Regions:
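Short, acidic/polar
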Residues: 260-276, 336-351, 400-408, 536-549
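Acidic/aromatic/glycine-rich contiguous surface patches that form carbohydrate-binding/processing clefts
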Residues: 544-577
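Glycan-binding loop/region signatures in secreted carbohydrate-active enzymes
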Residues: 234-240, 465-544, 576
Length: 577
């Protein structure tokens, strides 16, 4: 019996021993860091020997640098979007432009020469190479004009670029450790980190921190292996920020747009001005883009200018792209030659009529069509204006997701004033609503002030409104609740202040305060149609002027003369001196 028990015990013991060994092995595997290394060519997505990865501010870019004859070239779109948006590539005429505060710097494709205004300079090797879809620009040429630094590394080839400056958090490795693809000891190793090596901490975690090495490897490191954690100031001591100057007035701007549709209208300027108070800038709508070569239509009058000057009023001629629908503004602005012609035409008009300022009112611009070209147009025009003592103002819509390309901050570097077109919140073809509700205007102003200094902002205000006509799509349905405007055909007509008020009283309606819009509102029924109007009057105007005063803006602008009730000017002069 004992002989039978002994082998059984041995077998059980062996099973326990084997299970123990398996358990211990499993624990060892679980808690032993992997030594697997990540393929850095795969990590940086490098597929050919002439490519270099681009790491910008510790983020790996989808774009790649090209190594050509030992020189580093980067794609124009990468330069524009990630390094310096002031570079402009004219793909039509194969020229690279960069605009400083005082000069236009140009470089033709496949040339080593760049021109600063009219002075030629030799860069030493090809600056820009045209490609089928874009252009490749020498990185050292970009660096010459940009607040960036870069370093090159190999195995694999990569370029580490810094564009953001300021405070960063750094740490040192307390012992030899690793940067891994993800947080965890089983994640592949990106880099062996030596004791004392400095890293930038990008994100703090409980056990693992996201960090970047100086040679552009971004991964995760055990927080317990870091020491000497501190905040460091990152500076580029090799770059001096460019100084921009502006032609600004030592008084509040009170600008009135004066719509001129033919030359004979200019003779009415004395009567128009006599009905205003406090206006110190007239902006007549005299000029518009009239052909695809950059030519202008001209409705201006020297007598008009002389009269304004005799009254102590400046004249800022308005130049627009709206009147001639047959003109391809995109073509004009995307070709450097025709864009230059347009600028020269504007300056010629300014000289001929002794204009004090130029007001640019280009609208319906999309980024895809010519957004970047429009900003380049403003830069180049600003240099010409400033060289001749002429003020430049630019009319812009309120900031929105679809017009971020306007780059208002850079626009403000070059233009003297940015005029917010604080109207057309609702427009012909939209749902019924206010032309410029107070919350909408306030938001638009606040968003603009995030990019443009207050002393360069002029708030544009409407002197008109829209009366909305809502007709049921089903003629058998009575006008009831209009919350669902999809049930109605909606049209609108523009009315000046007095004409809109007359419509309200003429239809036996009563206007009452609408707290949501900050305006007086009226509605009435007629012939199974509902009419709505958010009035522009002294109430709405004063609330916007209060915004000008509160935010210490450069002034206000009004569209357009002839739409106003004469009583508004007493309110205007309370706020604009």
């Amino acid at each position: 019996m004992k002989k039978k028990i002994l082998p059984a015990a041995i077998i059980v013991g062996l099973i326990i021993l084997i299970l123990g060994i398996i358990g211990i092995s499993s624990l060892i595997r679980k808690y032993t860091p992997t030594k697997e290394t990540e393929d850095l060519n795969k990590y940086f997505n490098i597929s050919s020997e002439d490519e270099s990865a681009l790491i910008v501010d510790n983020t790996v870019s989808d774009s790649k640098a090209k190594l050509i004859d030992g020189k580093i070239y980067v794609d124009y779109n990468f330069v524009h979007d990630s390094l310096n948006s002031r570079f402009y590539w004219d793909a039509n005429e194969n020229v690279l432009l960069y605009t400083t505060a005082a000069d236009i710097v140009s470089a033709a494709a496949d040339s080593s020469t760049y021109t600063v205004t009219k002075q030629a300079n030799d860069f030493g090797y090809t600056i820009v190479k045209a490609t089928s879809s874009s252009a490749l620009i020498a990185l050292d040429y970009v660096k010459q004009f940009s607040n960036i630094t870069y370093k090159s590394y190999d195995k694999p080839s990569r370029i580490v670029i810094t564009t953001s400056w300021g405070k960063i958090e750094t740490a040192s490795a307390a012992k030899s450790t690793q940067l891994r693809v993800k947080g965890g000891i089983k994640s592949p190793i990106l880099k062996q980190v030596k004791k004392g090596e400095s890293l930038t901490i990008l994100e703090k975690g409980t056990k693992w921190d996201k960090a970047a090495s100086k040679d552009g490897i971004v991964g995760y490191i055990k927080a317990s292996t870091l020491s000497d954690i501190k905040t460091t100031e990152l500076k580029n001591n090799d770059y001096t920020e460019e100084a921009f100057t502006h032609i600004k007035k030592d008084k509040d701007i009170c600008l009135a747009w004066h719509q001129i549709t033919n030359k004979s209208s200019n003779s009415k300027v004395a009567n128009v001005i006599s009905s205003t108070k406090g206006v110190n800038v007239m902006s007549p709508t005299w000029f518009y883009l009239n052909d695809n070569n950059g030519g202008l239509a001209d409705l201006a009058s020297k007598d008009y200018v002389n009269y304004c000057h005799s009254q102590g009023i400046e004249v800022w001629g308005l130049f627009s792209n709206l009147e001639n629908k047959d003109v391809d503004a995109a073509s004009v602005l995307t070709h450097t030659s025709t864009r230059t012609t347009l600028i020269n035409q504007i300056m010629s008009a300014a000289f001929n009529y002794e204009l004090d300022g130029v007001n640019i009112d280009f609208e319906n611009i999309t980024k895809e069509a010519y957004g970047d070209s429009y900003i380049e147009f403003i830069r180049e025009l600003a240099i010409k204006c400033h060289n001749n003592g002429i003020s430049l103002s630019v009319d812009v819509t309120v900031p929105a997701s679809y017009n971020k390309f306007f780059n208002r901050a850079d626009m403000a570097n070059f233009a003297d004033y940015v005029i917010i077109m604080g109207y057309d919140e609702h427009y012909n073809g939209s749902d019924a609503g206010s032309v410029a509700s107070l919350p909408w205007v306030t938001t638009g102003l606040n968003d603009t002030l995030k990019e443009v200094p207050a002393d360069q902002v002029i708030l544009g205000m409407p002197l008109y409104t829209r009366i909305w006509e809502l007709t049921p799509k089903d003629a058998d349905n009575p006008v009831t609740d209009t919350a669902d405007q999809s049930q109605y055909n909606i049209t609108s007509s523009v009315y000046g202040m007095d004409a809109a008020a007359a419509q309200v009283s003429g239809n036996n309606a009563t206007a009452s305060p609408d707290e949501e819009t900050g305006q007086n509102y009226a509605e009435w029924n007629a012939n199974n149609k509902l009419y709505k109007v958010w009035l522009e009057d002294n109430t709405s105007l004063e609330k916007r002027l209060e915004l000008v005063d509160k935010n210490k803006l450069a002034g206000a602008a009004f569209w357009k003369l002839g739409f106003e009730n004469s009583s508004i000017w007493d309110i205007v002069i309370k706020y604009l001196d």
